[in-house]
């Protein structure tokens, strides 16, 4: 309920105070997809989906992880049925239904009728129960409505906006694109939040972006994959005028800098933050740690579906390793606090933290959540 109220507050207000700089709204990129390492017949270790991206199950999993919403990508089949697919071709995320074999030639959803797509192909997953047909936009929006999840539509199809508006209303979805004329079509039918990707404009001066946002009108903001664009000054200039700022799938550790700079929405493949009012199943607390006192914690309990988060107040440089795979090297010249974390499945979490010779960790709070 608290997450839903926060979501409504953000989407129904352009006020900068809707969120604090270190607590952005969290949106799961292509849903709460998951993957695990598997060994191929040739002995190679590769990552395989468990919960496929852009699937109905990815909406439910995003809700389970505690995200406020999901982002999805919309395309037409040959007979103009709207389905979810990110890549230009289906080859990375889809297999043949008959024998679960990989596609040998490039194939687009637009090459197939909807019936052909549903009959002959399934989403790739290491879990046979997840090998289901590519979902329609309507199916995914219905799942968003079921769980009270915001749907962020990365789409160039005005018909997709009309469907989202009809099913979810102004506060239930977001239009997300880099083309002004497409976003104008969304504004004609809805007072939803609109996020403009300014990446295609030649001059990315913030005031030129503001001119584009003013033409769109209503609730709007920007979304960018370019971390060099979303500086503290850029974010502050937009947010002081009531616009939202979304960092889009920044890689480790750059999402932390985006939060320092003041983004209001974090579109992410992995990130999780410490949660208010949610009890952790395992925790670690440390104070006043110096260079000679590194933290090395391996929890013994395996968690099926969880998150490891860290809140750290420090000065100097710290090196943080989450679950042996996500490394953060963070520096502060004056004392301050950063919050970071990652979602994971089917593992016992671990944490390593070291501080530079001239630094000190004032407080370290690590929490493991189980969903």
Predicted regions and their residues:
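Sec-dependent N-terminal signal peptides
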Residues: 4-13
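Exposed aromatic-hydrophobic patches
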Residues: 338-344
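Short, aromatic- and glycine-rich surface loops/edge beta-strands on solvent-exposed regions
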Residues: 349-357
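Edge beta-strands of extracellular beta-sandwich domains
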Residues: 361-369
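Phosphate-group recognition and catalysis centered on beta-loop-alpha active-site segments
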Residues: 18-295, 350
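Short, surface-exposed beta-strand/strand-loop-strand elements in extracellular ectodomains
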Residues: 318-324
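Short proline/glycine-enriched turn/loop motifs at strand-loop junctions of beta-rich domains
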Residues: 305, 312-317
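Solvent-exposed serine/threonine-rich low-complexity stretches and specific carbohydrate-binding patches
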Residues: 326-334
